[in-house]
Swiss-Prot record:
It is found in: Cell inner membrane; Cytoplasm. Pfam families: P-loop_SecA (PF21090), SecA_DEAD (PF07517), SecA_PP_bind (PF01043), SecA_SW (PF07516). The lineage of its organism: Bacteria, Pseudomonadati, Chlamydiota, Chlamydiia, Chlamydiales. Part of the Sec protein translocase complex. Interacts with the SecYEG preprotein conducting channel. Has a central role in coupling the hydrolysis of ATP to the transfer of proteins into and across the cell membrane, serving as an ATP-driven molecular motor driving the stepwise translocation of polypeptide chains across the membrane. Belongs to the SecA family. This is Protein translocase subunit SecA. GO terms for biological process: intracellular protein transmembrane transport; protein import; protein targeting; protein transport by the Sec complex. SMART domains: SecA_DEAD, SecA_PP_bind. It catalyses: ATP + H2O + cellular proteinSide 1 = ADP + phosphate + cellular proteinSide 2. One of its GO terms (molecular function) is ATP binding. ATP binds at Q99, G117, E118, G119, K120, T121, D631. It comes from Chlamydia caviae (strain ATCC VR-813 / DSM 19441 / 03DC25 / GPIC) (Chlamydophila caviae).
Amino acid sequence: MLDFLKRFFGSSQERTLKKFQKLVDKVNLYDEMLAPLSDEELRNKTVELKKRYQEGESLDDMLPEAYAVVKNVCRRLTGTPVEVSGYHQNWDMVPYDVQILGAIAMHKGFITEMQTGEGKTLTAVMPLYLNALTGKPVHLVTVNDYLAQRDCEWVGSILRWLGLTTGVLIAGSPLEKRKEIYRCDVVYGTASEFGFDYLRDNSIATSVDEQVGRGFYFAIIDEVDSILIDEARTPLIISGPGEKHNPVYFELKDKVAGLVQLQRELCNQLALEARRGLELYLDMDILPKDKKVVEGISEFCRSLWLVSKGMPLNRVLRRVREHPDLRAMIDKWDIYYHAEQNKEESIEQLSQLYIIVDEHNNDFELTDRGMQQWVDKAGGSAEDFVMMDMGHEYSLIDSDESLSPTDKINRKIAVSEEDTQRKARAHGLRQLLRAQLLMERDVDYIVRDDQIIIIDEHTGRPQPGRRFSEGLHQAIEAKEHVTIRKESQTFATVTLQNFFRLYEKLAGMTGTAITESKEFKEIYNLYVLQVPTFKTCLRIDHNDEFYMTEREKYHAIVNEIARVHKEGNPILIGTESVEVSEKLSRILKQNRIDHTVLNAKNHAQEAEIIAAAGKLGAVTVATNMAGRGTDIKLDEEAVVVGGLHVIGTSRHQSRRIDRQLRGRCARLGDPGAAKFFLSFEDRLMRLFASPKLNALIRHFRPPEGEAMSDPMFNKLIETAQKRVEARNYTIRKHTLEYDDVMNKQRQTIYAFRNEIIRSEDVFPLAKEAIYHVSLMIASLITSRNHPTGHSLPNLEEWMNYSFPIKLNLDELRKLTTLDAIAEQVAEDLIEVFQNKFSSMVEEITTAAGDDVDAKGICRDIIRSVMIMHIDEQWKIHLVDMDLLRSEVGLRTVGQKDPLIEFKHESFLLFESLVRDIRIAIVKHLFRLELTMTREQRPQNVIPVVATSFQNDENFGPMELTVISDADDDE
């Protein structure tokens, strides 16, 4: 029935395209009407459209005419030289109907899927122009600085011709330059530049003059799937150096390396014994049928299963797994030990190891034997694995009658410090083990100039300046024997998911989005529209070729390269890591095939390498760097011989990455071909392939070196990829659910901070803080539920110590309710503060004269105090939230939902944060004293130093400079 309705009414995509096509026809009609206009008259259309918008006409109504204006300008500029990245090239683009269709979809808030070479960059100009007519902020977000600069210079020339201003955000631009850029009608930049400016404006800027952004109205995200999905779990973090080094990484790195080496030696021994035993039974090609022999072989396979849990990449294990029957036996043991009834036997087997490595979930676990080895031989401590029960410890202290109240407090402080040290040591130990067992050099990171540089797993690009969080970066530095730098402290953070939700309107464009349409809809409320191609794609997509072993696969790849290279086709070979690209490069050198390598180690030559990749006979080996955002243009000779030939050395866990690699060839009607080579040793195949696939290869194993190639295998691979994508989507959605809690708190704090910065008079905000603090303290200390009881003297003592002020207890005793007492205390505090404020104004006026705005100076002092304590307490809160997030998962043991627990406890933490901010602000305001000096100063400069009363160590001095017109004698 559903299929019948689709055939009758058309799919949702078809109906949307049909509706937008009517608007395309209107655009073309307006384009003809604009043809007779002079250049000046066409430019004036921008002024006219802006005026019409201000008078109430909607953007939707103006869309056909505005898009026609852009199209007409493109036609008029044909042949005009444009400088792009230092080179001159003639403008030669006029939007096709399919590009106009895509532009309409972007304005309507769609993600447009347009194939490589279909002109996404030009398509974006039309919605950018239309939305910039509002005068509100309009941004185009790219994946790197180069593309932002290129697009601004190239297609931005259309916008500038029409009288709009354009700017490009480049990393490292100074404050004043960035403010000027944000004032432009259209701003180009990377997601991180826009995101970090948002964080700086809301966490570092202390005045309106230091804030650069002007809001979030409309954004188009280029390569939207990369930014909103691949990078969604990577938060933007502004951080600074921590207060001190964690000595754990120095102390434990050699001990951890020794424990991992013991594990490696144990697994090597088990694997070698199993291989020798197997060689006695069979020639590794034909499995015997004798039952006793098979049982013996099965026992050796059990040992290899154990090796797979200790060192999954063991060479002997990988060699044995090339035999389909032996692979099946090892997998059979895996299934056997996963059964609930065999759990105890599984634990007994795994107890032989020191560490259990879970490659599938990228995790590990120390066994009892590993812990014992750590204590007995590695010089570790049993306390490294035991956390203190703080409730029990505090209870013991409270019940110890021999301790005085002061001793109990000191003992609790000591216990708390010991608990903190134990947790830090245990955390450092775990991160050192993670670095040794799960983080691979030239896969997850590279080592350069005494530094660890992260490699982006999706793009293959180096990420200098980024660091793994939670001490993992220091652990890798210890592993690789480079300088171990201080752990960073987070000042501000936001995920890209929540940052882009700030925009009133959001759109995107990419060549690969339809496979993630569900996630775009559920997370961002964005629909995906597949835009038809202008020219038919001529790419030949060959079936994947499957080989039993990695060795056979590489042999086949080299043969394919040699064959295609002989015909003259340019070849692009895509690899999944730096390690694989270098390995393949060595093989090609041995076979005397000239080639160029592009990976994270030589990314500086990217533009030069890509420019030559489309030439006749070129061979380029590249990581995922060449899979997205790169446009390989063919020379005429390469087109004649059949275009670019793309070879994939493995399938990525995401289908989109594979589609991006295929999309490098056959752009805009050019010829091209793509083929992927896989082996059953590839990570995707080992961890996520269907059991059906293993059964098939057991029955249909081809001769050595011969490929298996069939659409059925392609389907099975796609199923494995879907399984991984579903798992990753669940992880991203789960992460977002937690970050949504943090996001609400972030927005509340940032709103309060901005209110302080932008308010001309912060005095009412200070009074409000004083009011809340006095209510809270008075209610707490005078409460009958409080341990001190209903005690006004206690209240007086606390107020005198904290602020300090003296209360009129006789007046308070006349009041009969706690609310009345709290209100009276609040009024008294506010009155004292008003008097203090007036005194400060008088002091400054006396010192600097009437020409100085003394009230303004005092307001600036109050503003600085308030912002300082918001920032300090927020940093502490971020640490507390991280700790809560890492610990809350353990609540599942008590049959509790971690997310609900996180929401509940984070709310309590936030209440505590607000309380601590108010108390810190009020304490500081009441302890302020002004010091006026003129010694060794220019005649008209008077420093005003606001210091804390009684030299409180929590509040340092702040100095403001007052420029006075008065002479020195006044």
